[in-house]
Each structure stands twice: as C-alpha cells, then as structure tokens.
Amino acid sequence: MVGNNTAYNTNAPKSVGPWRSTNKLVKIMNDSFYDLPCPVNLNAWWSFGSMLGLCLVIQLLSGLLLSAHYTAHEDMAFDSVVHIMRNVEKGWMLRNIHANGSSMFFICIYAHIARGLYYGSYLDKTVWYFGVHLFLLTMAEAFLGYTLPWGQMSYWGATVITNMLSVSPVVGESMLRYVWGGWTVCNATLKRFYTLHFLLPFVMVAVVFLHLFFLHEKGSNNPLGIESGTMCVPFHPFYTIKDLFGYVCFSFFFMYLVCVDPELLGNHLNYWPANPMKTPIHVQPEWYFMFAYAILRSIPHKAGGVYVMFLSIVVLYLIPTLHTGKYRSLCFYPLNQVVFWVLVGSFISLTWIGARPVREPYIILGSAFQLFISLVYCWTPFLYGCEMNYLNTLNFV
C-alpha cells in the first residue's frame, strides 16, 4: 500500500522533460522542426525546401504592405505603382523585394523539383502530389501578380495567356468572357486578378502545411534513397546551421537583385502604361515561364500548342509511375543520370529560346528541345529496365 500512495500524490510532477516537449501546443512545432529526426547524409540540395518557406514569408509580408498602397483600377494601377516607387517611404525597396522575390521563389522551386527528380523523392506520392499542387498554385499566383502593374507587357501578357482558355471545347469562349468580365481584358479583369492574387497565398500556406504534414509522417528522403530510420539526427542544431548558411547565401544574391540590379530579371516594357491600341513586337512572360512559352510557340496549331504546354507541366503528376527501378536515387543509374541532365539542359535551353524573337532558328530549336523532353519521359522506364538487368548480371541486386 505504501508503494501505491505515490500514484495519488497530487504534488508529484506530472511531466518530465524539456518545456518544448511537454507543452501541447509547442510540442507540435518542436516535433516538426526542433527535434525532427532527419537522415544524417542530407546535402545542400535539401536546403532549398526551407528557402522556399523563407520566400513565401517574404512574399506574404511584402505583398500585404504593397496592397496598402496599390489601386486595382485600370486608370490608376500603373500610377499607384509609380507612387509606391517615388513617394512611399522605402517603397522602391518594397516593390523590388516583391518583384525579385518571385524570381527567387522560382529559382528555389525549380532546384527543389530537380532534387526530387534526381533523388527519387517523388516515390513518396502524397508528398509529391501536394508539391505539384503547390507548383501549379505558384505559377497561377505569379501570372496574376504579373498583370497587376498594368504596364504594356502586363496587359498584353494577360491578353495572350487568358486567350488560351478559348481552346477548351464547348465552354472555352464562355470561360474567356467570364474571366475577362467583358469582351476584352479590362478593369473587371484587373479586379478579378487582384482579388485572386490576394487570396491564393493563403491557400498556398494551407497546402504547405499539408505538404509538411505528410513529409514528416514518413520522414525525409536522402541522397542514397535508402531507409534511414535508425540513422537519424535531430533537425537542430545539425540542419538549422545548414539552413542558416543557405539563408545567408540566398540573402547575398537577393539583396544584389533588390539594391543593385533590380531589373536584371524584369522586362523594361512594363515601364510603359498599358496601351490596348499598340501591340508590342514581342509579347513574352517572365523568365520563369519562358520554357512553357517556347513550347507553346514551337507548335503552329494553337490548341495543340496549349495542350502540349499544359502537359509539359502536369506530367509531373505521372513521374512516380515512370519509376520502375529497385532503387530510388539516380546515383545507382548512370544512364538515367545522363537522361536527367538532358532534361535539365533542355529546360534551360527552352528558357533561353523563349526570350528570343519568334523566327528561325529559334522556332525549330524550340520544337527540337520539346521533342527531347517528350522522349525523356518515354525512355525513362525502358532505361530503368536495362540498368536493372545489367545490375542483375553483376549480382548487385
């Protein structure tokens, strides 16, 4: 009976351990970041995920501050941007941070996707699918934001991109008129785009939490693509230091863009107000959409170009089904490593071609690189089979 008295002692401590592990609310964050078990062999490519989180925070804060000074009206939108640049205290920096933050966002997201493709992270299908959802939301958000300054390239870019809806069978024209709010891109279009541009980031934050939830449920992948449940270290301090170093490197390049060369990745035609009566010689999107634009114009048929461009993006959903090998990482597949770098080279080449005028040889080059990308997806399962057969002959598997 004496031994049982301690069970009813109300003065006995109810919990043991650090405060971050016993407080119910803090414990959620602690288990997700501080004490999160991580594989011991993660390299620098895994830092781009945390950089994306930093980019999202930067874009949210700078966007909220800019929205306090922006006017969503076709007659005042351009002037409100000029007002931000000239009259608002540090408005030039705020606008440059938001404009170049989108470029940094896409640099990080393309690196993040490339890491997932190379190291086989897509085999965690739920995590991968939510990541692709985020990529599509980011593209939509970037397009909507590109139209808001209502400059010459913004206006005509919105006209060209929204016209793609017309290729949809039966409902295409109705969808186009609904998005425009009239018979052409107008004030109603700008208000719709501003509203969606303001709301979508909050949807993205929700999807980010789902992405992280499913990631932490199974644990992170690693460069070797092997199970690492018994070889893990806590996220802090091992990977917080790596992430902080990544933030410092990120900040150097980001602040160079903001303070020294803010127009390096921009388009000078957007410094002219939108003029519906004058079409630019070369209507083009921002650099991070150039690959899709090059694919679009490499196919003469309008509907065919739109469908192929759309498939070049949503094909990411099919990537897990193309993996037929035993190992996750491409470290064990030399031929597929070559195919991967062909894919990267084709993507960079299409980005460069998209910025060139619509004439030969750029049109034929765009078609060639688009064909390379299509063949990559067709060859991948076959190459996995060839390499697995070769490894079988060497008794490696």
From Swiss-Prot:
PROSITE patterns: CYTB_CTER, CYTB_NTER. It comes from Mytilus edulis. Heme b b562 binds at H98, H197. Heme 1 (or BL or b562) is low-potential and absorbs at about 562 nm, and heme 2 (or BH or b566) is high-potential and absorbs at about 566 nm. This is Cytochrome b. One of its GO terms (biological process) is mitochondrial electron transport, ubiquinol to cytochrome c. Belongs to the cytochrome b family. It is a multi-pass membrane protein. It comes from the Eukaryota. The chain crosses the membrane at residues 48-68, 92-113, 128-148, 193-213, 241-261, 303-323, 335-355, 362-382. The main subunits of complex b-c1 are: cytochrome b, cytochrome c1 and the Rieske protein. It is found in: Mitochondrion inner membrane. The keyword Cytoplasm does not apply. Heme b b566 binds at H112, H211. Binds 2 heme b groups non-covalently. Keywords: Electron transport, Heme, Iron, Membrane, Metal-binding, Mitochondrion, Mitochondrion inner membrane, Respiratory chain, Transmembrane, Transmembrane helix, Transport, Ubiquinone. Component of the ubiquinol-cytochrome c reductase complex (complex III or cytochrome b-c1 complex) that is part of the mitochondrial respiratory chain. The b-c1 complex mediates electron transfer from ubiquinol to cytochrome c. Contributes to the generation of a proton gradient across the mitochondrial membrane that is then used for ATP synthesis. GO terms for cellular component: mitochondrial inner membrane; respiratory chain complex III. InterPro entries: Cyt_b/b6_C, Cyt_b/b6_C_sf, Cyt_b/b6_N, Cytb/b6-like_sf, Cytochrome_b, Cytochrome_b_C_euk/bac, Cytochrome_b_N_euk/bac, Di-haem_cyt_TM. Its main location: mitochondrion. A ubiquinone binds at H216. Its cofactor is heme b.
